[in-house]
């Protein structure tokens, strides 16, 4: 079983590092980006199995990245967890409206994020048959 490849995109480098360390402890491969434009480019190039996106980022916010991912056939099925300080009901609704699979607000518990990733990975099916990941 291949390890899960996860894109983490947030403009706060210490948050990216915190997430990266916790995901890599699970044996997963982590690709990082620090703004929305770079995140979108890395999704297209790296083809991750899952994305963790902040909302408030330079150049392109996380909602714009999410909307773009959902419009493109190559990326429309990639699961997305929004991880953001935007915690009002309207923000959460907007995230789900644009196609987020889960919405986690900051401050967050890194192990809760790990749990979300496991839950999504276990239920993800891209139509090519059963997909299994080594979840550690």
Please tell me what each predicted stretch does.
Residues 17-25:
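Charged docking surfaces used in two-component/phosphorelay signaling
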Residues 27-34, 42:
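Short hydrophobic/Thr-rich beta-strand motif most characteristic of the beta2 strand and flanking loop
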Residues 57:
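Receiver (REC) domain active-site loop signature in two-component systems and cognate sites
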Residues 108-118:
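C-terminal output helix
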């Amino acid at each position: 079983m291949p390890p899960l490849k996860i894109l983490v995109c947030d403009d706060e480098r210490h948050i990216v590092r915190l997430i990266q360390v916790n995901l890599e402890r699970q044996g997963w491969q982590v690709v990082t980006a620090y703004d929305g434009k770079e995140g979108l480019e890395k999704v297209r190039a790296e083809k991750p199995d899952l994305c963790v996106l902040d909302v408030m980022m330079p150049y392109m916010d996380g909602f714009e990245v999410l909307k773009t991912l959902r419009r493109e056939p190559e990326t429309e099925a990639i699961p997305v967890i929004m991880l953001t300080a935007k915690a009002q009901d309207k923000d959460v609704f907007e995230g789900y409206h644009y196609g987020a699979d889960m919405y986690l607000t900051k401050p967050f518990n890194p192990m809760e994020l790990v749990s979300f990733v496991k839950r999504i990975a276990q239920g993800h099916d891209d139509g090519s048959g059963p997909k299994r990941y080594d979840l550690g």
